[in-house]
A protein has these predicted regions:
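Glyoxalase I/VOC metalloenzyme domain signal
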Residues: 1-110
């Protein structure tokens, strides 16, 4: 359960990459297409927790990435929950890249 996991990790001090913009979450129904009817998770909660959503022909997935865990921004963890999807969230690549860039800008390492 990615929602409970992310909430617990945040409570324990784990920091995640900054969330995609609100427009990202507005586009989720379009990205999920036929899989939107399968989605049980509340989109408001997904957005509040900054969890990203993607789909492939087999289903959808939920994923989030921690901030880098070392001084060099090269190691981070991914939390992923697959709901039939077999891919790796390729549709989230741009959102992930932009989030990493925002974090680097905050750190002054862009």
């Amino acid at each position: 359960d990615i929602i409970k996991t992310v909430m617990e990790l945040r409570a324990r001090g784990v920091e995640f990459l900054s969330p995609p913009p609100h427009a990202y979450y507005e586009d989720i129904p379009k990205r999920l297409g036929k899989h939107m009817s399968m989605m049980k998770e509340d989109l408001n909660v997904i957005e509040k927790l900054a969890i990203m959503v993607d789909a492939d022909e087999d289903g959808y997935l939920l994923q989030i990435f921690t901030k880098p865990v070392e001084d060099r921004p090269t190691l981070f963890f991914e939390i992923i929950q697959r709901m039939g999807a077999k891919g790796f969230g390729a549709g989230n690549f741009k959102a992930l890249f932009e989030s990493i860039e925002r974090e680097q800008a905050k750190r002054g390492t862009l």
